[in-house]
Amino acid sequence: MTQLTCFKAYDIRGELGEELNEDIAYRIGRAYGEFLKPGKIVVGGDVRLTSESLNVALARGLMDAGTDVLDIGLSGTEEIYFATFHLGVDGGIEVTASHNPMNYNGMKLVRENAKPISGDTGLRDIQRLAEENQFPPVDPARRGTLRQISVLKEYVD
C-alpha cells in the first residue's frame, strides 16, 4: 500500500510528480466513486497547465466506478460549489492548488448540496481506498458517461 501524502486535512494538495500525478488522480476519482457511489457529479479545473490532464484522469476513475461526470471545464472552486448545488448532482470535484506554487496541484471535493468533504467527513475513507488501489474490475455495462456542459450563464446571473 502506497501512502499518498497529497491528502491534507481539508483537501488534496501535492507537488506534481511523485505526490500528485495522473495515476493518483485516477485513483482519487475511482475511490470517490466507489466510496460515495454518486450517480452523477460535476468536475472542473483551474488555469494551471496540469489541471486538464489531472481532470481527465480523475473523470476516468469516476466513470470506471460507475459515476456519470459533467465536466464544466475551466472553473474556480466557487463554480464547482455552485454547479453541484444548482444542478442537484451528488457531488463535485475542482482540480486546483489554490494559492500553492505552480509546481503543485490539488483537488477540492464536495458531496451533494456542495457540502465539503474533509478528514472527518469522508476524505480519510477516500484516501484509504486510493492508497489500497484494490478496486473491483471495471464493468463496461456499469461504466459512467462524460458530458461537457457550461453553467457560466447561470453562475454569472
Swiss-Prot record:
Enzyme Commission number, as recorded: 5.4.2.8
Co-factor: note: Binds 1 Mg(2+) ion per subunit.
Pathway of action: Nucleotide-sugar biosynthesis; GDP-alpha-D-mannose biosynthesis; alpha-D-mannose 1-phosphate from D-fructose 6-phosphate: step 2/2; Capsule biogenesis; capsule polysaccharide biosynthesis
UniProt entry keywords in alphabetical sequence: Capsule biogenesis/degradation, Isomerase, Lipopolysaccharide biosynthesis, Magnesium, Metal-binding, Phosphoprotein
Chain residues that bind Mg(2+): 98
Pfam families noted in UniProt: PGM_PMM_I
GO molecular function: magnesium ion binding; phosphomannomutase activity
Cofactors, names only: Mg(2+)
Cysteines engaged in disulfide bonds, as pairs: none
Classification via InterPro entries: A-D-PHexomutase_a/b/a-I (IPR005844), A-D-PHexomutase_a/b/a-I/II/III (IPR016055), A-D-PHexomutase_CS (IPR016066)
UniProt keyword annotation of ATP-binding present: no
GO biological process: capsule polysaccharide biosynthetic process; GDP-mannose biosynthetic process; lipopolysaccharide biosynthetic process
Active-site annotation: 98
Reaction catalyzed: alpha-D-mannose 1-phosphate = D-mannose 6-phosphate
Highest taxon of the lineage: Bacteria
Annotated family: Belongs to the phosphohexose mutase family.
Purpose: Involved in the biosynthesis of the K2 capsular polysaccharide biosynthesis.
Record protein name field: Phosphomannomutase
Organism: Klebsiella pneumoniae
Primary gene name: manB
